[in-house]
From Swiss-Prot:
Record's keyword terms, sorted: Coiled coil, Isopeptide bond, Phosphoprotein, Ubl conjugation
Keyword Ubl conjugation: yes
Tissues where the protein occurs: Expressed in brain.
Residues recorded with modification Phosphoserine: 96, 98, 274
Residue stretches in coiled coil: 211-247
Taxonomic superkingdom: Eukaryota
Family under the similarity heading: Belongs to the MSANTD3 family.
Myb-like domain location: 13-78
Protein name: Myb/SANT-like DNA-binding domain-containing protein 3
Record organism: Homo sapiens
Cross-link type Glycyl lysine isopeptide (Lys-Gly) (interchain with G-Cter in SUMO2), residue numbers: 154
Length: 275
């Protein structure tokens, strides 16, 4: 390779570079994937991408990239992952196998975990209710009479019955299904609330981490400015000392010249006599 040949960065990201990018995006995901679109959040995302690009370029064995290239690569990875997971969702519903299911995507589960709100409907397919077969042999060991089951469940679940109406009493299977649905709904709500609090906490920690990075950069810049001011002051002091030394040497030489031209002994001669 000739010395004057310019080495250009690789056009495509390697698997190693994608892995490093995913690790850094996961580090700042609660800022980069925030759904807010106000000016403060947009500016914060911009600074976060710049900090991420600085960390990325400091890694060994990677090509230098700016934050725009890294952001574009991450958007392409997200779009590809959403497409494949949507296809998997459709295939699960159809109960069929497709060749696309074996498509390899780097860190698909990790990418999905970074997009909880966008891919939630893809990750958690609705639970199917088991069909009720009272005559099935597999359920004989769990079979109980409707009267016994209703007596136990009526202590916890009450259905008001209006007077003057002849509404049939709900069957025990309907009571059990309703109770299970209510329990799952309550559990999912608690899980969603807990997940929301965790995401809010992680987002606050990411913002604090970014603020610390920015404060450190400001302090480093301030120290560098003070060092430059000290160097300038030292240089100015050195120049002033050189000027003063030159003035001192000038007056010393002038004094020596004056002493040679007008020696002190010439002033001690007697005054000449008048004629």
């Amino acid at each position: 390779m000739q010395n004057n040949e310019i080495i250009k960065p690789a056009k495509y990201f390697s698997e190693l570079e994608k892995s490093i990018l995913l690790a850094l995006v996961e580090k700042y995901k609660y800022v980069l994937e925030c759904k807010k679109s106000d000016a403060r959040t947009i500016a914060l995302k911009q600074r976060t991408w710049q900090a991420l690009a600085h960390e990325y370029n400091s890694q060994p064995s990677v090509s230098l990239r700016d934050f725009k290239q890294l952001k574009k690569c991450w958007e392409n990875i997200k779009a590809r992952t959403k497409k494949i997971m949507a296809h998997e969702r459709r295939e699960k519903v159809k109960r069929s196998v497709s060749p696309l299911l074996s498509t390899h995507v780097l860190g698909k589960e990790k990418i999905a975990s970074m997009l909880p709100e966008q891919l939630y409907f893809l990750q958690s397919p609705p639970e199917e209710e088991p069909e009720y077969h009272p005559d099935a042999s597999a359920q004989e060991s769990f079979a109980v009479s409707n009267r016994e089951l209703c007596d136990d469940e009526k202590e916890f679940i009450h259905f008001p019955v209006c007077e003057g109406t002849s509404q049939p009493e709900p069957s025990c299977s309907a009571v059990r299904i309703t109770a299970n649905k209510n329990y799952r709904s309550k559990t999912s709500q608690e899980g969603a609330l807990k997940k929301m609090h965790e995401e809010e906490h992680h987002q606050q920690m990411s913002i604090l981490q970014l603020q610390l990075i920015q404060m450190n950069e400001v302090h480093v810049a301030k120290i560098q400015q003070i060092e430059r001011e000290c160097e300038m002051a030292e240089e100015e002091h050195r120049i002033k000392m050189e000027v003063l030394n030159k003035k001192k040497m000038y007056w010393e030489r002038k004094l020596q010249t004056f002493t040679k031209e007008w020696p002190v002994s010439s002033f001690n001669r007697p005054f000449p006599n008048s004629p």
